[in-house]
């Protein structure tokens, strides 16, 4: 915000946060928060009412990332669904799904697998609860060139966009970090 970024464009993307941080962000105009736990969701509802929330799901990164982060934060798909239903009941706006495939991920197809997990959450929420999500935060994980030759970030982005086009028939906003 101090750098001139509009608060409407900022996502509070950490699943571990203090109530005072949620309140501070909300008071500054931030209205998009990630969650992966009931207690955190309750905190968001209390200190950031009517905000949009997205849920971080656990995904497998396999052995193709140098630093697996896919299981460090997040919840399973059923808990993600339950949290989004609860969010709606608490006056929050269920908005999307987040995941991280691990840092220095060398296999672009891992994003496809993670996007399939996100799609399962999207579909079940819409079919069983009438909740239509709008966002996927696919985290980071893009490899940087060190010693080994790697595909360019543009190549990764093109493949991920193809996966999105294949899996999601309606408009979904995609965040990549």
Feature map (PLM): residue ranges:
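Metal-dependent catalytic neighborhoods of phosphoester/phosphodiester hydrolases
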Residues: 108-109, 146-151
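Active-site loop ensemble at the mouth of alpha/beta enzyme cores that anchors a bound cofactor
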Residues: 71, 150-165, 173-176
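Active-site-proximal beta-alpha core segment in soluble small-molecule metabolic enzymes
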Residues: 1-135, 159, 163, 170
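Short loop/edge segments at beta-strand edges and connector loops
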Residues: 14, 176-177
